[in-house]
A protein has these predicted regions:
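S-adenosylmethionine/decaboxylated-SAM
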Residues: 32, 43, 47-301
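Mobile, glycine- and charge-enriched loop segments
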Residues: 1-44
Length: 306
């Protein structure tokens, strides 16, 4: 394991504490009790990477309330030559539709289309031509369930330069959260394990066994050479089915940067995943109908006894 992973020694406890303070001091007092979707350790990991690699073009995919976005914008505005592109499919915050996506960042900053570009309401491939290439730092933190971030990673790879750091959040969500409904939230773990490149993983002292919920991979020439390893994982069982429009957007995008076989592979996998998920849903509905029928009979028997 030690030979496979990079020991993130730049992530000292001092650095973790520094960014713990930064993460809260950068928020207004009214937001201090907000439940951040990254812990102080995970923020330290992220900003430790920024400090070490000094990127000039950052892509953030998945914004939620915008706590991490706000810290990233704060970082970018302090750098002389650095820009941030923040993307999310949702125009409004998924937990509270009355608020805009990234509202915590918007409370303090206004997108200026120079240092900070806020892009919401479309799928990632629909923004990539606008964003352009030479991205040297990328954060993937969206739905966490397959196909989720896997589709986005394949889409964005042609726009990443060699040496780009790709940060993957919630790589061990089912283990860390012990949340049964999210037990299949493996999309970023799948990306981490199937992508060829230098892996950056650090032990989190706050979790049992030091298991970390955030990791990174550094892109190199072999990442592109062995991208079929990543494509192959599209055959893993999906937790949800994207709509037809979404699949068309991604399939057409892949066709521009990969061979026709990969685009056809996505379409074939989509068809098979659709068949499987429909069978799963039908089984669930049948089981529920049986349970309802049994409960109805039980209630009738109780009434007849009374």
């Amino acid at each position: 394991m030690k030979n496979f992973y990079t020991d993130s020694t730049f992530l000292s406890f001092e650095l973790q504490n520094e960014y713990k303070e930064f993460s809260f001091s950068s928020m207004d007092k009214k937001d201090n009790n907000f439940s951040f979707e990254m812990t102080s350790f995970e923020n330290a990991f992220l900003f430790g990477l920024l400090k070490k690699y000094k990127p000039t073009k950052i892509l953030e995919v998945g914004l939620a309330a915008g706590a991490t976005t706000r810290m990233l914008v704060d970082h970018v505005f302090k750098q002389e030559n650095c820009s941030l592109f923040s993307c999310d499919l949702n125009n409004n915050y998924y937990r509270d539709e009355s608020k805009r996506t990234a509202y915590l960042a918007l409370d303090k900053y206004t997108p200026d289309q120079k240092k900070w570009h806020l892009l919401t309401g479309k799928y990632l491939p629909q923004y990539l031509n606008y964003i352009g290439g030479d991205i040297d730092f990328c954060i993937l933190d969206t739905v966490h369930s397959l196909p989720g971030e896997l589709l986005d990673f394949i889409a964005v790879l042609p726009f990443l330069r060699e040496g780009t750091v790709v940060v993957l959040h919630d790589v061990n969500m089912p283990l860390i959260w012990q949340d049964l409904p999210r037990r299949n939230a493996h999309s970023n773990e799948v990306i981490l394990d199937s992508t060829v490149g230098e892996k950056i993983i650090c032990k989190d002292p706050n979790n049992f066994g030091g298991i970390s919920n955030i990791s990174a991979v550094v892109i190199n020439k072999d990442t592109y050479k062995y991208i079929n390893n990543v494509f192959s994982t599209l055959s893993f069982s999906w937790s949800y089915l994207p709509n037809q429009e979404e699949i068309e957007v991604y399939a057409n995008h892949y066709l521009k940067f990969y061979d026709a076989d990969t685009e056809e592979y996505l379409r074939n996998i989509y068809f098979l995943q659709k068949e499987m998920l429909e069978r799963v849903n039908n089984t669930k509905n049948t089981k529920k109908s049986k349970e309802n029928f049994i409960n109805k009979i039980k209630n009738l028997l109780k009434k007849s006894v009374l």
